[in-house]
């Protein structure tokens, strides 16, 4: 059958990348998936905005902290204004996000349990920002995987998104998560071509991924590839991280995926004929498809 041929091509042989994982004999990777029920549309997780616990400066922005223990917080502008950021900090790790709209956007609470500091920042000049409002919050996640199961500002989709409908279409006959991941990965690689012009245009600025736009135009950069694959997986109830960091070649984005009963695949994987490798749909679809160098993680989304 065509389906079996596809799966045999992408998961037929197991290979551990000892250089990256440092535990050649202790880590075994799955060669076939354990049967699991299909995700239903009713099971897809969506953020909500009760505003039972908020941070606000009263005029520029509002942050809804209600669902911090579910792995996310939400924020929006209170007026049309530029230069406003949300900062999420734990210990010495900081995530800074631009607030762009008066509609709520979702942001992951993904630095494990503990004390977080949340700030609303306003640009003064250049990279100088003033603190408009600040609070601390204690986080005790109900599910360690939760931050990677919801849409957020980076992995952005709704029930009306093209990627949402496509995710269910691609896996409707699959019986296990490993097969689902294989089909979702193959779709991203087969659908998207690397957009060199966009890469040049955004080389000096941060641009959010455009998942639906990329899938419909069949073009994107690494951020679009990674966010698209993560969205496809999350919609199916498969936790997936978009990771941004350094490779030997460039500053880059890739994906890490969670498998039930196996945990986070480490080293991160992508499906490639006759081996496990990093889940890097951009490199798999480019002249760097054989890249096996370093991946230094900086941010998880």
Regions found by a protein language model. Name each.
Residues 116, 129, 148, 185-187, ...:
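Aromatic side chains
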Residues 153-217, 265, 273-287, 295-301:
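Secondary-structure boundary elements
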Residues 224-301:
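Hydrophobic/aromatic-rich core segments of domains that either
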Residues 2-176, 264-265, 297-301:
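N-terminal accessory/pre-domain segments preceding catalytic cores
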Residues 217-223:
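A short, highly charged nucleic-acid-interacting micro-segment common to nuclease
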């Amino acid at each position: 059958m065509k389906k079996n041929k596809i799966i045999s091509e992408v998961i037929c042989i197991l290979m551990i990348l000892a250089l990256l994982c440092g535990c050649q004999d202790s880590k075994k990777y799955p060669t076939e998936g354990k049967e699991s029920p299909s995700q239903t549309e009713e099971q897809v997780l969506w953020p909500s905005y009760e505003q039972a616990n908020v941070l606000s400066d009263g005029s520029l922005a509002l942050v809804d902290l209600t669902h911090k223990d579910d792995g996310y917080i939400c924020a929006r502008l209170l007026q049309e204004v530029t230069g406003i950021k949300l900062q999420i900090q734990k210990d010495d790790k900081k995530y800074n996000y631009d607030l762009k709209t008066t509609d709520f956007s979702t942001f992951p609470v993904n630095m494990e349990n503990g004390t977080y500091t949340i700030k609303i920042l306003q640009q003064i000049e250049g990279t100088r920002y003033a603190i408009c409002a600040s609070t601390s919050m204690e986080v005790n996640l109900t599910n360690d995987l939760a931050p990677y199961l919801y849409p957020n500002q980076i992995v952005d989709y709704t029930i009306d998104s093209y990627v949402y409908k496509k995710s269910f279409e691609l896996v409707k006959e699959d019986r296990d998560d490993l097969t689902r991941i294989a089909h979702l990965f193959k779709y991203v690689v087969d659908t998207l071509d690397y957009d060199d012009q966009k890469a040049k245009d955004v080389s000096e600025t941060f641009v959010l991924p455009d998942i639906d736009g990329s899938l419909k135009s069949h073009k994107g950069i690494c951020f679009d590839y990674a966010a698209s694959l993560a969205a496809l997986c999350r919609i199916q109830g498969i936790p997936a991280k978009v990771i941004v960091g350094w490779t030997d070649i460039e500053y880059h984005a890739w994906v890490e995926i969670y498998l039930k009963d196996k945990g986070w695949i480490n080293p991160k994987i992508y499906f490639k004929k006759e081996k496990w490798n990093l889940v890097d749909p951009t490199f798999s679809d480019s002249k760097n498809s054989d890249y096996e160098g370093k991946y230094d993680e900086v941010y998880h989304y």
